[in-house]
Each structure stands twice: as C-alpha cells, then as structure tokens.
C-alpha cells in the first residue's frame, strides 16, 4: 500500500509540472493538532516567493476538491533550499560527489545516522563514503536524507 506522501505525489506531480516546476518532494508532518503538508518545488532558475504562492494556490484547490487528508493541516510550499532533502533515487544520482546526512529506518552496522559523500548509486543502493569507509545503504531503508551545504 502506498504511503500518504506517495499518494500525494501521484495527485500533485502533474499539476506542479504543468505550472513549470519540478515536484521535488512532499512531507506530511504530524505534530498534535497542527499537522503540516510541506510541498517542495524546484525550477530551472530557482524558485521565488511568487512561484511558491502560485503553486500553493493550485495545490490548495486540488487538495480541497480531492480531500486526501481528512485531518486539519497547514499547507507550505517552498524551495528545497541549500540543505535540500532527498526523496528519490534520481536525486541521489544528481548529487553524487556532494555530502549528505542520512537517517535510516533500521540500523545498518549498528548505526542509523550517517554523514558522508555520496559516492555512487546503483539501482536502489546508495554508496556513502563515511570517514574514508564506503557504506552501502538501501534506498528503501532511508528515512530521511539531506544535502549538507558546502560554504567553503
């Protein structure tokens, strides 16, 4: 069965693309009474506040009609930013050579958190070089991943 995020991606990807943006990813964060649906968009030339407002208006209208989330929530539309989250295998491929912070669902080698350089992507296996050692992680076991910005 598809997760809520997967169902929302299926619902919203085509309308976001039709507006000229890439649907980078979706997070649904439950926090008591104040859940948040966060929609990340990216564009060839970046994303402006006006772009986010335009996509927010369209996404809000679709969500009102389709009503896939029955509880109350806040809708946020934003750029993924410099520390962009990675939601898809293709995004890991795009950032080979960049540093990433990864949290796993289940521990590998007695660890759940890794920070290292994305070395390679083969199928759904991500190789991360951590402290000079290669760690091969299954994409399906990744709970959360973000690019670590390099300001040097």
Swiss-Prot record:
Gene3D superfamilies of this UniProt entry?
Ribosome maturation factor RimP, C-terminal domain, RimP-like superfamily, N-terminal
Top-level taxon in the UniProt lineage: Bacteria
What CDD domains does the record tag this protein with?
A: YlxS_C
Q: Name one GO biological process term.
A: ribosomal small subunit assembly
The protein's location, in the record's own words, is: Cytoplasm
Which key words are in the record?
Cytoplasm, Ribosome biogenesis
Q: Which GO terms describe its cellular component?
A: cytosol
Give the protein family: Belongs to the RimP family.
Q: Please describe what this protein does.
A: Required for maturation of 30S ribosomal subunits.
Protein name as it appears in the record: Ribosome maturation factor RimP
Q: Could you tell me the gene encoding this protein? A: rimP
């Amino acid at each position: 069965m598809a997760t809520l995020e997967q169902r929302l991606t299926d619902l919203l990807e085509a309308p976001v693309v039709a507006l000229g943006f890439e649907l980078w990813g979706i997070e649904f964060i439950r926090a008591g009474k104040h859940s948040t649906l966060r929609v990340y968009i990216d564009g060839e030339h970046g994303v402006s506040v006006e772009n986010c407002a335009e996509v927010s208006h369209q996404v809000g209208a679709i969500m009102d009609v389709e009503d896939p989330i029955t509880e109350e929530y806040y809708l946020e539309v934003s750029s993924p930013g410099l520390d962009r989250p990675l939601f898809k295998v293709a995004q890991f491929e795009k950032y080979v050579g960049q540093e990433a912070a990864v949290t796993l669902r289940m521990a590998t080698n007695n660890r759940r958190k890794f920070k290292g350089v994305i070395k390679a992507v083969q199928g759904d296996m991500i190789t991360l070089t951590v402290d000079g050692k290669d760690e091969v992680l299954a994409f399906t076991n990744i709970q959360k991943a973000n690019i670590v910005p390099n300001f040097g």
